[in-house]
């Protein structure tokens, strides 16, 4: 049962719109959240995913503001995180309300090419943005917490998002280092978390108005910095999972007062059918738990009408960038290796970079950012150069195969075989049906891909009697659940 202290209840009663009931708000705070997921369209179409999972008995109810989002009903026993389909990146476990900010960012046919997600971890919104961008352009995903950067990176790789650059900074530096560099920015700000009580009953046990006021000051700094980093004409979406106006409307008002000639609020009243139920006079979405039976959330869409004066001068460019472009011979050899080994093609508009014996693939849009700030991870690691030839990296075949969908040199696994593969086991060729065994018998031995649901799981080495598992040790799972 949610523990709402008296101070919070008294505070929220004043904030609650007149047409909503405090008693209903308290009742919804005690209701468990519905499970929700988002289909990863970088790897599978929503229609195909729905067909596969409804055949397995999943009951999916669409989230109205996200074409790829669904609530799962009637399957209380589902351990979503251990499902094969989750491990292979076909879906992300994401609270329905948190799908709103990326949807707002790309509403009205926004075709932003260079995007910043200021506070990205664990990666739900960042990977949603990557899917909306269809792995094109550049997504800079930042996270202040060092431990959470690792989680963010793991989720970016699992979902096959390749046009990303990860950073580890306080979000307040972007206006200084990358002034007016982004077409669109999502600032899902750190907040008091008042909307999360349905999944954390103790979230508001020690609520205090002084804490709300204090975090509001940080939010003001963050939104100012994000606005400075936004190009004129660009879109900034400010969002939180909290309910107090001090952390929501008042932060947007602060930005408007700071840059009165450059800030324009764009209405989200028509973002989806029923959005008007949560829409404020300014056009913000203030989502109370009882409106859509979801977490509490706030979303504002802000357009930058004009350039604004930067606060600080551009810092000096950083030296000693450890990567260099591959030469034409190296690019040709690596391209041929991926095609001969896996029937995978390297994107011609991306840039192959070299660091020692490591080959990387950078988004072309990243190149102007070199030297402007330190990046934790850029693009994807393609392969290591060996004494003879190359050794492909798992993240490369996952990302590249997502673009070509089940390339020719791939062996489809059964559910049981896929389970074994993800648990680090080799696959005996005798476990395939007779036609497939005959096919394997005439195939040349060596590296090849394995897939499930026609989506690549990883690399194996065909040794004749078995397919040797090359899954990286840190990705091997102890528990993999089958639902088909």
Curated annotation (Swiss-Prot):
Gene Ontology, cellular component aspect: cytoplasm
Pfam family name, one: Methyltranf_PUA
S-S bridge residues: none
Keyword terms, alphabetized: Cytoplasm, Methyltransferase, RNA-binding, rRNA processing, S-adenosyl-L-methionine, Transferase
Transferase among keywords: yes
Biological processes, Gene Ontology terms: rRNA base methylation
Domain of life: Bacteria
EC number(s) on file: 2.1.1.178
Residues annotated as the enzyme's active site: 241 (nucleophile)
UniProt-recorded Gene Ontology molecular function terms: RNA binding; rRNA (cytosine-C5-)-methyltransferase activity
Residues that bind S-adenosyl-L-methionine: 119-125, 143, 170, 188
Subcellular location(s) per record: Cytoplasm
Enzyme class: transferase
Reactions accelerated catalytically: cytidine(1407) in 16S rRNA + S-adenosyl-L-methionine = 5-methylcytidine(1407) in 16S rRNA + S-adenosyl-L-homocysteine + H(+)
Similarity comment text for this entry: Belongs to the class I-like SAM-binding methyltransferase superfamily. RsmB/NOP family.
Summary of the function given for this chain in its UniProt record: Specifically methylates the cytosine at position 1407 (m5C1407) of 16S rRNA.
Protein name: Ribosomal RNA small subunit methyltransferase F
Organism per entry: Shewanella frigidimarina (strain NCIMB 400)
The gene coding this protein: rsmF
């Amino acid at each position: 049962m949610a523990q709402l202290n008296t101070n919070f209840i008294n505070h929220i009663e004043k904030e609650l719109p007149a047409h909503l009931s405090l008693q209903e708000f308290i009742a919804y705070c005690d209701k468990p959240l519905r499970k929700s997921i988002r289909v990863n369209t970088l790897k599978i179409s929503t229609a195909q995913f729905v067909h596969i999972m409804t055949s397995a008995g999943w009951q999916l109810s669409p989230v109205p503001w996200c074409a790829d989002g669904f609530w799962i009903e009637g399957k209380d026993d589902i351990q979503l995180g251990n499902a094969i389909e989750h491990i292979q990146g076909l879906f992300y476990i994401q609270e329905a309300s948190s799908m709103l900010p990326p949807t707002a960012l790309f509403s009205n046919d926004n075709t932003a090419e260079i995007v910043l997600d200021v506070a990205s971890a664990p990666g739900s919104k960042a990977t949603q943005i990557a899917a909306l961008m269809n792995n094109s352009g550049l997504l800079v995903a930042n996270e202040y917490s060092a431990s959470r950067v690792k989680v963010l990176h793991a989720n970016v790789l699992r979902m096959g998002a390749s046009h990303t650059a990860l950073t580890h900074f306080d979000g307040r530096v972007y206006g200084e280092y990358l002034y007016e560099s982004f077409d669109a920015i999502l600032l899902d700000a750190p907040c008091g978390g008042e909307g999360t009580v349905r999944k954390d009953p103790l979230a508001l046990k020690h609520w205090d108005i002084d804490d709300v006021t204090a975090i509001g000051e940080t939010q003001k700094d963050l939104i100012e910095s994000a606005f400075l980093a936004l190009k004129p004409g660009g879109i900034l979406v400010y969002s939180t999972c909290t309910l107090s106006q001090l952390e929501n409307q008042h932060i947007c008002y602060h930005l408007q007062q700071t840059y009165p000639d450059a800030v324009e609020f764009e209405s989200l009243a028509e973002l989806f059918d029923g959005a008007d139920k949560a829409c404020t006079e300014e056009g913000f979405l203030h989502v109370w738990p009882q409106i859509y039976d979801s977490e509490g959330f706030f979303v504002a869409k802000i357009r930058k009408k004009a350039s604004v004066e930067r606060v600080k001068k551009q810092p000096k460019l950083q030296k000693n960038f450890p990567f260099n472009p591959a030469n034409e011979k190296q690019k040709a050899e690596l391209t041929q290796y991926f095609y001969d080994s896996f029937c995978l093609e390297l994107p011609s508009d991306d840039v192959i970079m070299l660091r020692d014996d490591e080959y990387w693939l950078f988004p072309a849009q990243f190149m102007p950012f070199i030297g402007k700030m330190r990046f934790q991870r850029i693009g994807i690691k393609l392969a290591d150069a060996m004494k003879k030839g190359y050794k492909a990296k798992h993240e490369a075949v996952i990302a590249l195969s997502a673009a070509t969908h089940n390339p020719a040199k791939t062996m489809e696994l059964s559910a049981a075989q896929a389970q074994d593969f993800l648990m680090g086991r080799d696959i005996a060729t005798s476990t395939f049906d007779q036609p497939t065994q005959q096919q394997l018998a005439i195939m040349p031995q060596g590296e090849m891909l394995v897939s499930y649901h026609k989506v690549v799981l990883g690399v194996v080495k065909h040794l004749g009697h078995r397919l040797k598992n090359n899954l990286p040790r840190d990705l091997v799972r102890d528990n993999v659940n089958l639902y088909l």
